[in-house]
Amino acid sequence: MKIRIMENADLSAVINMMRGFYASDAVLTNGSEEIFRADAVECVSDSPYLEGYVFENESGVQGYAMCAKSFSTEFGKRCIWIEDLFVKEEYRGQGIGSDFLAFISGKYSDCVLRLEAEAENERAIHVYKKAGFEVLPYTELIKL
């Protein structure tokens, strides 16, 4: 499995995976075609805010991830939010998510890493905890 930066040629495959991810129980909102495209295009631009990654093998794309950059005043250092982490159903359980978490932990070893998970997504939470993430007791709020 190879992890690489998302490219323009990946947009169609990534947007298709986003449709599946956002239609699943892993997220609260369903997103929209407009949002999926904006997110994917932001990943392949020179954006200082969002990075996109693709996981692939000789058969093709296995999944994707998107990471947003910010600063954590709580911890006094840069913060990487793992916004999306999606592995196609047929490739789950092969360590791809764990490999990505190890990759991003190494790349941003001087940063706080954060992510969100639905409480019901026990399989993902197990992977995150195994990678060293801890559950925070916060209630998250949003204003759109």
Feature roles, as predicted:
Residues V54, G60-K69:
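Conserved beta-strand in the GNAT
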Residues E83-R92:
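A short, internal acetyl-CoA/4′-phosphopantetheine-binding micro-motif in the GNAT/acyltransferase core
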Residues Y91-F103:
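Conserved acetyl-CoA pyrophosphate-binding loop and the N-cap/start of the following alpha-helix
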Residues I5, S105, S109, K129-Y138:
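Conserved acetyl-CoA-binding loop of GNAT-fold acetyltransferases
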Residues E42-V54:
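A short helix-loop-beta-strand connector motif used in the catalytic cores of GNAT acetyltransferases and
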Residues K2-N16:
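A short beta-loop-alpha structural element at the N-terminal edge
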Residues R19-E42:
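Conserved GNAT-fold acetyl-CoA-binding loop/helix
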Residues S98-D99, R114, A119-P137:
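Conserved active-site alpha-helix within GNAT-family acetyltransferase domains
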